[in-house]
Regions:
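Acidic-enriched, low-complexity/disordered segments with a strong bias for Aspartate over Glutamate
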Residues: 2-3, 23, 34-38, 64, ...
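Short, compact, well-ordered microdomains
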Residues: 59-100
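A short, structured beta-strand/loop element
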Residues: 29-66
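Broad hydrophobic/π-residue packing in well-ordered secondary structure
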Residues: 18, 22, 40-42, 82
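Charge-rich alpha-helical segments
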Residues: 11, 19-20, 49-51, 56-59, ...
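Negatively charged, low-complexity tracts enriched in Asp/Glu with abundant Ser/Thr
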Residues: 1-28
Length: 100
């Protein structure tokens, strides 16, 4: 199993990867997909949870939809295949967009 992808990392380590961001905050990442289809397709995206002191989440950021599929699993597959470097780039864009 390749732990350089989001899905691989989660399988190998049994937890989501965490990143430091340009805003000085720590974030973990999760994926999500629509519960119901829109126009026959499901969207999938990344959800970044911002952590405060201790173990309490204090906010979140999310990407726009990154992939679509006929099922939630089909939509999630390309998101889970993203490299951790690509995931970090999405986090950096979300942080920049949030502070603009």
């Amino acid at each position: 199993m390749d732990d350089t992808t989001l899905g691989g990392y989660q399988q190998v380590h049994g937890r989501p990867p965490a990143f430091g961001a340009a805003d000085g905050q720590a974030y973990s990442v999760a994926t999500f997909a629509d519960d119901t289809a829109d126009a026959g397709r499901y969207g999938a995206a990344l959800l970044f949870v911002r952590w405060g002191e201790g173990e309490k989440p204090v906010g979140h950021l999310e990407t726009d939809y990154l992939a679509f599929g006929a099922t939630p699993d089909e939509a999630l597959a390309p998101v889970l295949a993203l490299t951790l470097e690509q995931v970090k780039a999405h986090l950096d864009r979300c942080v920049a967009r949030g502070s603009a």
